[in-house]
């Protein structure tokens, strides 16, 4: 028996230390695993949340039948987990998959990483909610959304009901995701692509936009028969 803890940010799985966590100011690496191990008298291990999700999906979810897969997780941030030949790809420095910090808009908003126009500033839950707020303030009309009620789940539900402003926003998000995924597909040629997060509640609109962009930006031979599916473990 052991304890496993997953966190966002930068994790050194060799030393079991947390090096960086978004929105937290860590002046030195955080030895959380050791504190938990001492408290419960059990071996404790630290892992990255998105990469751990990709591995869990490979063991128990929609990619358990795949040699290679690419998982994109969208929540407060945006990250990727890559499985190659049944093994999680972690790289020499053990921190890979920061797909949310690929620039998609050179004139866009400042990202928490310090760069401008990262994918995360466009497609994270908060980015989508903030963009919808701006659209509503600018006079765009929605039967299902208001300035008081436009969280990510409400936006997805509105899109599913063919609300014009919600659908247009989800399509824009899908296009930006598709552009970045196309780069990843050209590099890794995954057997299957998995999308995880609340935004998959609008997967009919979202996936159509992603697929269109993938087909126009990625190598046809790499993307032609590559399934695009929603995670089965998104909120677990």
Q: Model-found features: residue ranges?
A:
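Structural motif
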Residues: 61-64, 94, 185, 221
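Glycine-rich phosphate-binding loop of actin/hexokinase-like ATP-binding domains
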Residues: 64-123
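ATP-binding/phosphotransfer module of carbohydrate and carboxylate kinases, centering on a glycine-rich
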Residues: 1, 15, 38-42, 106-107, ...
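Glycine-rich phosphate-binding loop and adjoining helix at the ATP-binding site
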Residues: 1-68, 205-216
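Residues that form or immediately flank small-molecule/cofactor binding pockets and catalytic motifs
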Residues: 23, 49-51, 93, 107, ...
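Short secondary-structure boundary segments
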Residues: 7, 48, 74-76, 125-126, ...
């Amino acid at each position: 028996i052991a304890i496993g803890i997953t966190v966002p940010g930068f994790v050194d799985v060799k030393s079991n230390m947390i090096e960086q966590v978004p929105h937290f100011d860590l002046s030195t690496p955080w030895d959380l695993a050791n504190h938990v191990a001492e408290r419960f008298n059990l071996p404790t291990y630290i892992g990255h949340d998105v990469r751990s999700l990709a591995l869990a999906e490979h063991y128990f979810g929609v990619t358990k039948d795949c040699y290679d897969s690419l998982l994109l997780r969208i929540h407060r941030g945006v990250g990727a987990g890559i499985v190659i030949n049944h093994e999680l790809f972690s790289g020499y420095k053990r921190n890979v998959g920061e797909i949310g910090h690929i620039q998609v808009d050179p004139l866009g908003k400042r990202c928490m990483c310090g760069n401008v126009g990262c994918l995360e500033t466009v497609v994270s839950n908060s980015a989508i909610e903030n963009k919808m707020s701006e659209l509503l303030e600018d006079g765009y009309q929605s039967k299902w959304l208001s300035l008081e009620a436009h969280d990510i789940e409400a936006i997805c539900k509105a899109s599913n009901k063919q609300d014009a402003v919600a659908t247009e926003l989800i399509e824009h998000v899908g296009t930006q995701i598709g552009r970045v995924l196309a780069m990843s597909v050209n590099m890794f040629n995954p057997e299957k692509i998995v999308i995880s997060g609340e935004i998959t509640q609008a997967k009919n609109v979202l996936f159509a936009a992603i697929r269109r962009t993938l087909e126009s930006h990625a190598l046809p031979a790499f993307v032609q028969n590559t399934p695009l599916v929603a995670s089965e473990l998104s909120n677990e």
